[in-house]
């Protein structure tokens, strides 16, 4: 009993680990530009643009004990491709996503199938208007963001 009480006290007093690189930098009281975080997959340290990109995409830091990793831009793309190839479920075109989900396009969280960033409202509406596909992968919806759209549309020529 006493051991359980001690264990619970330690657990209760353990601070919650940061989930973003910005939160990590704030916790360490260092500038974001000085925050060096390795990629979980390739081991390369993320450069400043990748750090900003990681947080913009609302990705979550991976903690293994007290060791933290993130995901670089190249590995994000590789992960997106892997997930699509291994866990693809279905495709709907344009506004049909609302019929498939029973939700408004405004209420859906959709990540880019290529870079994993969240699509904003304009990107989702653009995909609906153009009749572009939305893919269900691992029970989550994927579309195409404005950055990756140019690659996607140029490949159709």
UniProtKB/Swiss-Prot annotation:
A zinc finger (unnamed) spans 39-75, 112-148. Its main location: host cell. InterPro entries: E6, E6_sf. Signal peptide: none annotated. It comes from Human papillomavirus 12. Pfam families: E6 (PF00518). The gene is E6. This is Protein E6. One of its GO terms (biological process) is symbiont-mediated suppression of host innate immune response. Transmembrane segments: none annotated.
